[in-house]
Amino acid sequence: MSTAAVVSALMVGALTLGAAPLAAQAGVGGAAGDAGRGRQVYERYCVQCHGERTDGAGEVARWSQPRPRDFRQGIFKFSTARYGFLPTTADLDRVIQNGLYGTRMPPFAALSTRERRDVIAYLQTRSPRWRTEGPGTPIAIPAEPTPTREAVTRGRELFEANCSKCHGDGTGNGPSAVKGMVDDWGAAITPANLTLGRGKWARTARDIYVRAMAGINGTPMPESADVLTPEQVWQVAHYVQALGGWSRSTPELRRFAAELPPPGAGEPAAADTVKQ
């Protein structure tokens, strides 16, 4: 394969989604698309990375880190449903449209709504999970509170008690990361550097809230829905947002973070860290 062809294929990219049997909507979790047409979309835009068998072993997969998704397993990292459940069509559509920042998965916003739904329907034929399971129910997202200095302070305490084992000081340098971590596909992974102001999927405090609540499927990133209250997760989200140049992170919010005392200077988060 020539260098030009490889570059071209990388630009075309690959999808990270999933969807229902080759007869369009057959199956419990199927999207309202045509799987036959979706296969044609897949072969044009996705096969270079995700492979002819949708196994993540396309011609340019070797240059991709993380590796392209193997759709046959029915595991999708980014979902608005709780950990372990299949994603909604809207979840998959978001990944197709926006891509995954910092990876080889580019945005496919130029695809029509029908093309996106069709390719989702095709990918849902590639895993038996879609024939027996429906998508998970999206987590409830309460209205975002106005961040305050007190909330950001509490957010750091909660972060240190619940997140620092992997994320460390926010740069992904926690003790678990130092030891080495792997995902469900056996690939080495590192926790996100939250000071960069953007994650693969997350852009806003609302996105951070969803990821903290739902976790990331196929990785050691757990859900916190049974551990923290919605109020506490918002506090963590605003603290993380204050760490870097996240979308809608205001100068005031960043000042709150800058004014925090050094780690360990105050009382650590105690029993109320865990949802009662």
Language model: regions and residue ranges:
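N-terminal secretory signal peptides that target proteins for export/translocation
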Residues: 1-4
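Conserved catalytic-core motifs of eukaryotic protein kinase domains, centered on the activation segment
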Residues: 53, 59-61, 176-178
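Extracytoplasmic electron-transfer domains, predominantly the class I c-type cytochrome c fold
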Residues: 62-110, 116-123, 180-245
